[in-house]
Curated annotation (Swiss-Prot):
Component of the inner kinetochore constitutive centromere-associated network (CCAN) (also known as central kinetochore CTF19 complex in yeast). NKP1 interacts directly with OKP1 and AME1. The gene is NKP1. Belongs to the NKP1 family. Component of the kinetochore, a multiprotein complex that assembles on centromeric DNA and attaches chromosomes to spindle microtubules, mediating chromosome segregation and sister chromatid segregation during meiosis and mitosis. Component of the inner kinetochore constitutive centromere-associated network (CCAN), which serves as a structural platform for outer kinetochore assembly. One of its GO terms (cellular component) is kinetochore. It comes from Kluyveromyces lactis (strain ATCC 8585 / CBS 2359 / DSM 70799 / NBRC 1267 / NRRL Y-1140 / WM37) (Yeast). The keyword Oxidoreductase does not apply. It is found in: Nucleus; Chromosome, Centromere, Kinetochore. This is Inner kinetochore subunit NKP1. GO terms for biological process: cell division; meiotic cell cycle.
């Protein structure tokens, strides 16, 4: 049931007088005798106007009590010539840290705990904001990286590279063993290439050839 229906139901329930001294039958006879004709469309219209007036008065009360504070001013407090995040971070870090000595008052301990907790949380949030800002200003194109990661399955890509690397090593081994016209100079260069690369961990070509 919406608010409008609830209000109309309450009006219907309370528009006729109720007498605790009457029993149900007597109350029903009284209700039938006092039939009020209520125009609920007019009631709804007046109700909406009343709510609008109430909202308007509440707004003016807030505006009067707080003052004409521009939303832009809130932004300038942390930008431009106002208080910067590094300055705010530094000021928070320089706030004193208190300690109770010979004081077991629970209210004092609770207040001190809240102060330290709030100070720590504010420092951590300022530090996090500074890190996010510095990461945002770097030259790394995160959009390109994310798009690449969404297209390439890195694990599958790594497995394919390992298979191709092993196939390359096997081909080199075959070349060294079966090519009769391969000169000693070229053979030596290939062996040096294998010896200085990751192929050495895959094949022991040098030992087999020699």
């Amino acid at each position: 049931m919406d608010l409008e229906s609830e209000i109309i139901q309450l009006v219907r329930q309370n528009i006729r007088p109720k007498f605790p001294s009457l029993n149900d039958e007597q109350q029903a006879r009284l209700d039938n005798a006092l039939k009020y004709d209520v125009n609920y469309d007019i009631l709804k219209k007046e109700l909406v106007e009343y709510i609008d007036d109430w909202k308007r008065n509440e707004y003016y009360d807030v505006l009067t009590n707080i003052g004409d504070l521009q939303r832009l001013d809130l932004g300038n407090m942390l930008n431009g010539d106002g208080v910067s995040f590094p300055k705010l971070h530094s000021d928070l870090a320089n706030l004193p840290r208190f300690r109770l000595i010979d004081n077991e008052n629970e209210m004092d301990q609770s207040l001190l705990h809240k102060y330290d907790s709030l100070r720590t949380r504010l420092i951590e949030k300022c530090r996090a904001i500074e890190l996010i800002r510095s990461a945002t200003n770097t030259d790394v194109n995160y959009q390109d990286i994310n798009s690449m990661l969404s297209v390439v399955e890195l694990r599958q890509w790594r497995d394919e590279i390992q298979m191709e690397w092993k196939e390359l090593a096997q081909n080199l081994e075959l070349i060294l063993k079966t090519w009769p016209d391969l000169t000693e100079e070229k053979r030596s260069k290939l062996l040096q290439l294998i010896d200085s690369s990751s192929l050495k961990s895959i094949l022991h070509i040098k030992d087999n050839i020699e």
